[in-house]
Amino acid sequence: MNKTLFKSIREYKKQSLLAPLLVILEVLMEVLIPLEMAKIIDVGIANGDLTYIVQRGVILVVMAMLALYFGVQAGNMAAVASAGYAKNLRHDIFYKVQDFSFKNIDHFSTSGLVTRMTTDITNVQMAYMMSIRLLARAPFMIILSWIMTLLLNKTISLLFLIVIPLLGGTLIYIAKKAHPHFIKVFDEYDVLNNSVQENVNASRVVKAFVREDYEIDKFHDISKYVYNLFTKAEKIVAWNSPVMQFTMYSVVLIMVLIGGKSIIAGSMETGELTSVIVYALQIIGSLMMVTFVFVMIMIAEASSDRITEVMNEIPEMQDQPDAVTKVPNGDIVFDHVDFSYSGEGGNLSLKNVNLHIESGQTIGIIGGTGSAKSSLVQLIPRLYDVTKGRVKVGGIDVRDYSLESLRDQVSMVLQKNVLFSGTIYENIRWGDETASDEEVKRVCKLAQADGFVQEFPNGYNTKIVQGGNNVSGGQKQRLCIARALLKKPKILILDDSTSAVDTKTDALIRKAFREEIPNTTKIIIAQRVSSIEDADQIIVLDGGQIMGIGTSEELLKTNEIYREVYESQVKGGGDHE
């Protein structure tokens, strides 16, 4: 773990400090217990002094109870500190992600961010809890036990000066070997999660095409690859335990030989040898504890690197200190705009786009798949930044606005409509959380959603399940349009957002737009000519370039692409009733 992540401890610093302090007190009691046992054996039992045995026994019990108390309290403090640390980490990452542009999110992928906020943070949480308890306990136990061994038998104490560095070096070597493998494992967890996410989201498609076996095989291959990577890492870590066990038995055997000779020579008592063996076991037990924590830390180190990646990611878009906070109107200008998702030097999705949309106009955009229709409109609310040129809204470069102010005045209904778990009221109020019930119903009427909502048994209090799977595609689109309208934006963008709506309802929505929001700039991307033929201007896109601008009548005369689309749909009866 590093400085970036430690900042998230914040209000849990007190518990994080108290836990190791209580552990030290627990260790102190545990180290004194064998000394009392030696006195009971060498003095009380050797002399048959029952009073002495009882007196020392009471002290022994008190020490054990204190050790128990300190241990329990240390555990409680460590649990609170680690759980709080994990809570803060999740909050910090989630807060950070809210500032990410689409490009930042694309860099990590959705499944990658989810893994970091769940599995990776849990790994860091567990390692942190172990660290503030066991990493405080082990060094003090080793040092104090070694000092007590030194006081009882110098020869045996020297044995540990050889053993401890050897074991420490072995642990460091194992850790360095295993760490890269754990990083690979967690990177593959992203792929695994992505596979699960895709399958669950597309479960209807999977079943419709009877592709369950294919999906199972695909998941099995990814899962097996993760298994192989994890096994490779664990095989390296697995050397920890045998090395420790071999060391423990060897040390105990050597101690018994040295201690036995000392007892025969009269330089050591039986109780003292017993105490030395207990101290030796405490030292070796602490070293084994360190190996266990070491494994946790190795896993957590890989996770913390991935979390730090997110925390150190610089949001591509940031507000300027003197950012403009008011959008004057819905006037839009594209001035020699080039755009690439890969940035400077990448393949251009949009090439030398020059365009002026007057405030209040209705603009239609049409073009084939991959013609960059969505790319064009995503530059208006600054979901992405232009690679070259500039986009202006209300006469001001979009990069000069605060993101919140700009996006508050640009309502965009994306191709992929998203509804959240909650009631219809709650979903629509995403556009304006202070809106009254009447305002919600008004925008639903404009979006032609009020009719079907009223037919639900619970009306606007109907619960939308996750992903909006209990409403049809057309209903989902209309609810999303209503949500966008509730913002009362200066610019409304519909990115193929009426594709699942019948042409009659589509016409009613456009009629409502003309009559109820005439001053709002309306940009409609559509595959159907009927959805845009009454627009003030229609933009024809092909290969990221504007191939024509004009009314439907003008384009029929001057633009071959538009004429072909129009004739294939209208004359062929493809979409007119």
Across the structure, where does each feature detected by a protein language model lie?
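Membrane-integrated ABC transporters
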Residues: 1-30, 37, 45-59, 74-78, ...
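An intracellular "coupling" helix at the cytosolic face of ABC transporter transmembrane type-1 domains
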Residues: 10-13, 77, 99-103, 119-132, ...
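Transmembrane helices of ABC transporter permease
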Residues: 11, 15-28, 39, 60-63, ...
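Juxtamembrane helix-loop junctions of ABC transporter transmembrane domains
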Residues: 21-22, 29-42, 54, 63-110, ...
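Short intracellular "coupling" helices and adjacent cytoplasmic loop segments at the cytosolic face
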Residues: 47-48, 83, 91-115, 119-121, ...
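Helix-loop-helix
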Residues: 48-55, 144, 148-162, 232-306, ...
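Conserved catalytic Walker-motif region of ABC-type ATPase nucleotide-binding domains
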Residues: 97, 219, 307, 334-336, ...
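ABC-type nucleotide-binding domain
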Residues: 326-577
